[in-house]
Amino acid sequence: MKILLLILIAYLLGSIQTGLWIGKVFFHTNLREHGSGNTGTTNTFRVLGKTAGTITFLVDMLKGTLAVLLPIWLGVTEVSPLIIGFFAIIGHVFPFFTGFKGGKAVATSAGVLLGFVPLYFVFLLLVFALTLYLTSMISFSSITAAVVGLITLATFPAIHFLLDGYDPIFSAVLIIIALVIIFRHTENIARIRNHRENLVPFGLNLTKQNPNK
């Protein structure tokens, strides 16, 4: 019963679309009608500005971290905290409160890793940051971090010091998380291939994207 309750809490926690509610309450703006139409961090930055975007990222990430920590705090040992965290990701992607149309799972997935394997989170964050500087694309940086996450599973003996929380479930959950992130960026991948992906106002833009062409 406790496990089912934790799953429900994690899903409902993930279902809170931070950017959407910040836009409606403080800016009287529906994110679904502006920019890419997505309710996640990137579109919030683009439409509502840095402050709203930063708050959205932190809250969305915290949803994943809290979901992972809940079973630990409550002493529930019958299920891996990663499983509970995964349901927060499901909630973020398919939110009950907004017609099952949510974000791309990047920030919430990062929060899950932060709560379960902090060093590994830092490693993938550095991968994300470096890729963002080189390409100026949040989408490509997110996809790259997901792919690197998959690659590191094959090299686990070499990076075991980053995965102090590793167990067999970790591999399964990480694979699913990575695939969800990649799948949710299908439209971005198409724009990248056509050199029309949206950019952040810094970095090298090595792939020469031009969203205005």
Curated annotation (Swiss-Prot):
Record's keyword terms, sorted: Cell membrane, Lipid biosynthesis, Lipid metabolism, Membrane, Phospholipid biosynthesis, Phospholipid metabolism, Transferase, Transmembrane, Transmembrane helix
According to UniProt, the reaction catalysed is: an acyl phosphate + sn-glycerol 3-phosphate = a 1-acyl-sn-glycero-3-phosphate + phosphate
Q: Name one GO cellular component term.
A: plasma membrane
Per the record, the GO terms for biological process are: phospholipid biosynthetic process
Its Enzyme Commission number(s) read: 2.3.1.275
Q: Where is the protein localized?
A: Cell membrane
Q: Which GO terms describe its molecular function?
A: acyl-phosphate glycerol-3-phosphate acyltransferase activity
User: What topology does the record note for this protein and the membrane?
Assistant: Multi-pass membrane protein
Xref: HAMAP family: PlsY
Q: Protein name, please?
A: Glycerol-3-phosphate acyltransferase
Originating organism: Streptococcus thermophilus (strain ATCC BAA-250 / LMG 18311)
Supply the source organism's classification: Bacteria, Bacillati, Bacillota, Bacilli, Lactobacillales
